[in-house]
Structures are given as C-alpha cells and as structure tokens.
Amino acid sequence: MYQSIYYSYNGEDKGTCYLRDDKGGWSSFKYYPTVYKLDPDGEHVTLFGDYCSPIRGKFDWNDPTILEKDIQKELGVLRDLYYKDDSAPTSHNTIYLDIEIEILGTLTPQSIRDANAKITSIALIDVNTSKKYCYILDDKQSIEPVDKDNKKIIPCFTEQELLSKFLDLWIELDPTVVVGYNSDFFDIPYIYFRMRKILGEELVLFLSPIKKINDNIYNPHSPITIGGVNSLDYMLLVKKYIMKEEPSYKLGDIGTKYAKLGKIEYNGSLDRLFRDDPDKFIEYNLRDVEIIEALENKLQFIKLTILICHLCHVPYDSIYYNTVLNEGAILTYLKRKGIVSPNKPTTTNKSIKELNIGDEIQHQRGTPTIEGTITYIDERGGKCQIRTKSNILKERSLKTVRKKDSYAGGYLLEPTPGLYSYVSDADFTSLYPSIIKSLNLGVETLVGRIVTKNNYEQYNSLEQLKQLNPEDQLDIEKLNTKTYNLKKGKIRVKDLIELIEENNWSISASGAFYRNDIKSISCEVLEDWFKQREHYRELKKKAGKQEDWENYKLYDLYQLAFKILQNALYGTYAINGWRYTDGYKICSASITNSGQRLTKESILFINGKLENLVNNGRKEFVIASDTDSAYVELKDLLNLKYPDITDEGEKISKLIELSQELITDANQNLDNISRKVFNIQRKHYFELKQEVIVKKAYWSGKRRYAMWIVNKEGVPIPPDHKDALDMKGLDIMKSNFPPLFRDFGEELIKKILFDTSKQEIDKYILDFRKSLDTIDWRKLLKPTGLKKLDEYIAKKPAAGEIFSKLALKCPTNTKGAIYTNDLIRFKKQTKQYETFQVGDKMYLAYLKENPYHVDVLGLNGYNDSPEILEFVEKYIDKNQMFESVMKNKLENLYQDLKWGAVIFNNNVNKFFTFS
C-alpha cells in the first residue's frame, strides 16, 4: 500500500510520478492518465448514463466531450493502482518534530521565508524506536552530550553543525510522516529556508528522499512541500476532529486538556532561558514533542488521518480538504463499478467558477474565518489578491480559500434568555446524510428546480405547490450536464405537480426535484459507509467483550473514520468546483433548506403537542435549536403528570419516559412530513432521538448556553463526571478572558446550575472581587491582539515629549501598544526589547493615575522591559481590570436570570479600592 506520492508538474521530469509503497519501496514512472470521449458506440458508461470510449495520448483540452481530463494526477494514480484495496500501510517511519529559534518578532509568512533568526534547537522523537533527540546550539561549549535512557542530547558549536547533524539523522530515519504543531506554517518551512541559507541549495534538497521540494509562495499556511515526506500538522488535525471550538489552540493548553501534559514553565523570554538555563531549555524543547506524542497516544489523530486517506485514496495532505477526500472516495467507488466520472462543473463551464472579484473569502483549512474580499484573480498562477478587513492587500493560493457561504445554514431558534429546568433534547440522527439519502440527492438524479429569489427559500415543497393557483406559471431551470448551463423555462403549477407525482420525484424545501428510478452515487456511497461503520462498531463491541483492547481501538478508529466521512459529504456540494455537484449550489441549498424545514416543522409539532397536553396558556416549550437538535423544557408536563413525586431520581426516570413518548410522536410526524412536503413515497431516513436529560440549563442567546446533564443515552451522569456540564459560547467565560476570570465565570455558572442560592452567588462574586487585592497582577492582564496601529497615531512625540497624540476613537489595545512603543523608544531600549507590530498578540494592563498620565499599557508577556514591568506593577488598576472584563457580563447574567442589579458590595469605593 502507498506510503507517499509526489507528482512532478514542472521541470525536466514533468509528468513523472514518484511513489513509495510499503512492499515495493520507491518507484518512479511516467503517468499517462486515460481520458474518455463521449461516443454513442462506446463500451464504457458515464455517471449520467452516456456511452464513451477511452483515449490515451494527446487530446483537446477544450473539447467538452472529453471526460476525466481534470482529475488531479495524484488522485488518478492512487485510484488506478489501488482501487481494489482500502487498507492502510503496515508501517510508517513517523517522527514528531519541533524547533526553537532566536527571537524573531512577529512570525509572518515573510519573516519565516527570510529566516534571519538562528535555529537554536531541534527536538524530535522517532516513533519506531521511541528515541528522543535534541540538537542544541552550544557556542559556549557548556553542555555535556547525553546518550542514555533512549534520549540523546547533541550540543553543537555552530548552527551549521547543528543543521548538518540534524540532516544526517533525518536521512538515517528516512521519515515518511513528519508531525509537528503549527508545523505546516512554521517548523517545516523555517527549517527549509534556514537550511537553504546556511547549508546551501544542494544540501537542503536532501530533506526529500527524491530531492524534490516545492516552494509555494502563494500558500502562506503551508508554503513548503517536501517530496516523499507527508507533513501532518497536529494543530490542524485538532481543529478538524474536535468539533467544538477550543478556548485556546496553544500546544500547552491542548496538551493539558487532552493528555494531561503541559508546557515547561519559565520566567522571562525563551532567548533568556536559552542563555541562562540550557538544561531547562532542552527540557522545554523536548516537552513540545512529548506533548505531541502524548496527544497521539490519547487521540490517535495521525492513525485516523491515515485510515481516512486510504479509504478515500488520496495523499495525506488532502486530509484538510473535504472536497478532495470525497472526490477520491467517489472516483474509486465508480472505478470499481466501471463508471466514468464527469469533469468538474467549473472545467466545463468557466462562468460558474468558485471565486470572483468582490467575493468575501474564508480559509478552507482549520477553523473557517472570513479573511477579506478578492480584488484580483490570477488563475494561471493559482493565486488571488485579497483586501483584508484591516485594509491590507495579501496574496493567497486559490487552493486554500473558498467563497463565504451564500446559502442557508442550520436553523438556530433564538432562545429567550433565562434559566430552565427539566429539559430534554430532540436530536436528528445524521441530519444532512439522511436528507441526501431520503431525497436521493445527486447531480445525476437532479431533474430541475423552481426558480427562487435566493438560496434561502424553504417553502417550495409539494404541499406548498398544491396551495397555489393550478393555472399559475412557474419559472423553472434544468441543468444541462454536458455544458453545465441552466436551461430556463415555464410550467403551469398543475403540470409540475402531475410530473412530480407521476414520476415519483422527491422535492426539496428549496424547490429542486430528484428522480428516484435510479439511486444516486452519493446515496450508494453513504449507505456503504453506514454499513461499514456498523460493521466496525459490532467488531468493536465484540473486541471489548473479549478484552482485546488493541483491536478495540483499531475498530473504534475505523467506525470513527466512516462517521467523519458521512458527515463531511454534504458540505462539498456547496463548492462549485467539486466534481459531483451542479455548480449552482442547487444541491447544497436542497440539503440545508430541507434541514431547516425539518427542524422548524418538528419544533412546530412539539410545541403544539405540549400546548394541548399541558393546557396552561404556554405556547412555546422548545427553548432553542442548533442545526440538527432542539431542546424542550418538560417541567410543566412533568409537574402535571406527576405532581406528587419528590425524589429526584424518580423525576428523571419519568422525564425520560415522557421525552421518549414525545420523540415517538415526533417521528410519526416526520412520516407525514416526508410524504406531504418532500413527496417521499418510499422509505425515508429522517429520525429524531432523545440523547440527554438536563436538570438545569441557562441560555443567553443562540449557541450560548450551559447545561447540567444528568442522563446521557440512558446512562445516569453524576455531577462530577466530565460529561455533566456542557458549556458553550457564554460571554462570562470567553476564551479571550484572563484564565483567572474565565475560571471564575465557569465556576459561577456551575453554582447557578447546581441550585446555589442567589444569596450565596452574591457572596461568591463579592469574595472573588475582594480576593483580587492579593492576587499576582500578571494574572489579571487581558489577552488581546493588535489589528491596527499607525492609523491611530495622529502625531508622533515632539522633542521633549514621550507619547504620541492619538486619533479619535483609538481602540484600547491600539492605545496600549502605541504608549508602550513610545516608552521603549524614549528609554532607548529598541535593541533589547521589541516594539508592537500589527498582528502581534499582547496583554493589556489598565493603570491608575501615574506620573506618565497614561491609562493603559501593552505587554507581550515574554520579553518585556523590566522598567515597564515595574511601572505596571506599581500602578496597575485592579478595579478597572475587573470592570473591563467582568462587570457588564455579570450585569447581563443577572438580567437574564431576572435577579435585578448586581450588588457588588454596599460601599464599593471604600471596600474595593485596591492598592
């Protein structure tokens, strides 16, 4: 089975594929893909049912009847050579890697590319032997070499020696997979650029076993590809596989949370640690790779990635792109069936390209974030220029960006803020995959659609059509799958209804209709994945009963891999350039709008059902919803049915019974919806289930809540269990709070959920605020970032002045950065201490009245001027630090709970004036 693949698109060996296999080792060969031309007398059949014949050799790229001409070469090779086998390799040479460099300032794509700072140490772990290595720069020759206990410390007199010895080990270990943390952005490119600068162009190529290294200047997130070596960034894998957003993605925080292993703590800067305590510096450097090792032992994201990539027959670096994963999987599935795939819609019809000038774009890798607006596109160069929200022009690779979604997402019911009791959920099982299967959705089953004003309309169902005037004319569109153009037309309402019912077409909430006489390939693949997942779940259970824990973990990985693939398919329909979509977001709108319609109809049914049962004037019992789930307060029904029950355990048991009855009725309602709304006359896959019972819940807004879960999937959850508390998005415990305040907010919410009295809550707040007087001031600093700087400097300091004049409405963080920069320049410390630049992370310190008459300063937290630190310690305003972070949040919380005003104390100024 393949271990790595590299295809040469340029140079003397253009068209050569380099392939490493766990049995055959390295091979290289010219790859000439087979393409297919539409031919009524051909022996092969396409996805759309047309006949075609194979062509080998040259062909006219602009000929729209030539199919499979735009398949990425790596995907073509892996499909053609391995389509009969989904297994992963029996072995890999994996290393965990981390580097440290001299202080460089802000890490930007350009500063990494310039690579002006020395590499001071390189730590790695060879997974095959578990041996740890640390190469450290030791120009003072004060460090003794170590080679014992499976750990080797190699001091090097010069950086050139360090890099040369590291390269020797790299060649010896011959890695197939290298794993770091934020390594695609920093470690890998920095090693390459610094090594090229110090060792030269020829030696740096030895990082690649085939002497091929790609430098993609337009992909700042992963600019370097080392041919023959798979680079996997654990930070990106954490963002991919851990669905909830983490408060922090720093390695130390993730390691502490998931592997109980954090960073080595130290005072001052890393440069100072390197100079003053090299032994601890070595320990610090090794700890980073030890954390990666511990994370992988716990989470097994590398193994999971390799499994998924081999199930999909794609290179490992494709793991971050669901479009590539799903394309590889379906290409392979169709190859096994002897079916020829279509070209991408954007290959056939250039006018529906994914990106246009003026589009808002977001990153495809990691957590999607809106970055800016496109101002220029260079399709041949594979790049675009964007203008960020900070009005800065940047270049980006077309492979790493996508257009901001322009279709409906999941339905979010706006909750009424407050505290709720005895809550149950109604959760759709795999909502989007079930919609694809129920509608028989696919580009080859898509018949046409009713023209809508936008991609957010949800009321073009069969039921709505029957309420229209039968003689009214509707605008419709049909997709021409040979040209990917939309053919427009008109049809009377009654004629369309007749066509839908006679042909048994399913119709989505957005007005697209799909044939059911053939099964779409997406449905086939989803059903295959579902069966495979169930198969491995059964094997996992069997292994668990036999206490075969090695296979238990393996089967668990396989079932998780298939779950991830199932849930990833729907999003690819929104990408115009995905091979198996329509190019107009018709299919994607069908999925998400139908999902919204199902959720809304279910909420309507549940509210109506409970209104009739309880009959107390209340009309809304569903508190909130989030894409595929709704939360229902059953307190009134519980009190009505069982008014005399006082035992809490018995209440929960009865609550489970009531919620199950409600779910049964709601599922019967889904049977009606599938027929009336979607015209699904056969089996549908829509299903609601009850998963959690919540004793107490607090909602402050959409996706902002805290729940005390007492039962999950029928299993009682004790209050101290890790699953007992589910908190998300609450303002009082934001990720950008100082940890001290964030922990206080979390504990406060816990107390509220656990029925602590208001009087005790009031006291808890007072005690916390009073405690700040004796707490280390550094724990109060507010973490933030610097987005703007120079535009808020109205006038630089004149002779004899210290501080700049600021423009109006200068943000507080910008003000703090400007004042600190001014102080550093005034004290002539710019060579020892860095000034703030746009993009830097920083900490804010609010100040009391002081000799400088400034109210805030910024600190970087690792290499601050001792004079500035001493000044901040003397004049920090702890009152203002509390007010800026917590005051409004606490007031909003009390308002949500209808507790009135927050009484911090009876005599605030006297009681809480910090020294």
Whereabouts are the PLM-identified features?
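Glycine- and acidic
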Residues: 148-152, 172-176, 274-280, 412-421, ...
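Basic/aromatic-rich interaction segments and small domains that mediate binding to polyanionic partners
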Residues: 357, 362-396
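Common nucleic-acid-contacting/processivity interface regions adjacent to the catalytic cores
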Residues: 18-21, 272-354, 399-450, 456, ...
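DnaQ-like (DEDDh/DEDDy) 3′-5′ exonuclease domain used for proofreading
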Residues: 1-174, 287, 291-353, 400-409, ...
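Catalytic palm subdomain of template-directed nucleic-acid polymerases
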Residues: 630-662
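Active-site-proximal helix-loop-helix substrate-binding element of RNase H-like nuclease domains
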Residues: 132-135, 142-154, 174, 178, ...
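C-terminal, non-catalytic extensions of nucleic-acid polymerases
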Residues: 660-915
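Proline-aspartate-enriched helix->loop->beta-strand connector
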Residues: 166-190
